[in-house]
Amino acid sequence: YGKTLDNPVTFAQLLREIDKIEGLERIRFMTPHPKDIEEETLEVIRDSKKICNHIHFPLQSGSSRLLKLMNRKYTKEHYLEQVEMIRRILPDVSITTDIIVGFPGETEEDFEDTIDVVKKAKFDSAYTFIYSKRTGTPAARMENQVPEDVVKDRFNRLLATVNEVSHEHIRRYEGMDMKVLVEGKDDHEEGFVTGRMTNNILVHFAGDESLIGQIVTVHLDECKGFYYMGRLIED
């Protein structure tokens, strides 16, 4: 960012300036590319009371071989080094990711590399996808398309691992009082609203529409996997 401006600035400098704007209570910077994230940016997030404590850090695959075929410009080892840097500077950060299963040529060893990264990175959640051909892309023309039954089996194994790891990591907030930005009515429970903590974790609790847009304190009663059930604490 900012390299073509008359007075070049870094993305971290931009974030720092946005952080100074009065009236803003939450700033959400979500998705850096693994090859581009820098310590300066993480330090700005650490020092800010407004920038959300959440990094969406797309993995796609834990196999360095497949990452090269995907033209991702990083390796498994580099990705894990970046995760370590993020957690060193932001110890309580929530890290989420994207993962694709069944990319052409994916072997069992490649898939196990992905599972290994999930366990080591301790993601709070992961958006998991089954690879599908996109007309006109190099991957669609590749040989060694992975059989559908193999892809489905790997996808289910990945989901099981993600659920186990994320639940163990997310439940660290159980029993705590946390600030929640109320975003809307709960679609599944009458008389409930839903919101997000600064780390992007969803919280559902009893409340009415007048709370939407407010930041309130919620006691986190129970972790339900990727979200919490809680109760409003009156300030």
Predicted features along the sequence, with ranges:
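Conserved SAM/AdoMet-binding glycine-rich loop
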Residues: 1-108, 119
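Radical SAM enzyme [4Fe-4S]-AdoMet core and its adjacent flexible, acidic
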Residues: 2-23, 70-73, 133-164
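Conserved, mostly hydrophobic/aromatic
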Residues: 29, 57, 98, 118, ...
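Thr-Gly-centered strand-to-loop micro-motif
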Residues: 32, 69, 126, 205-206
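Short, hinge-like loop/turn segments at secondary-structure boundaries
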Residues: 45-47, 114, 143-146
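A non-catalytic, amphipathic alpha-helix used as a structural packing/dimerization or gating element
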Residues: 81, 85, 113-120, 150-164
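Glycine-rich phosphate-binding active-site loops on the catalytic face of alpha/beta enzymes
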Residues: 125-131
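Terminal RNA-binding accessory module
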Residues: 141-235
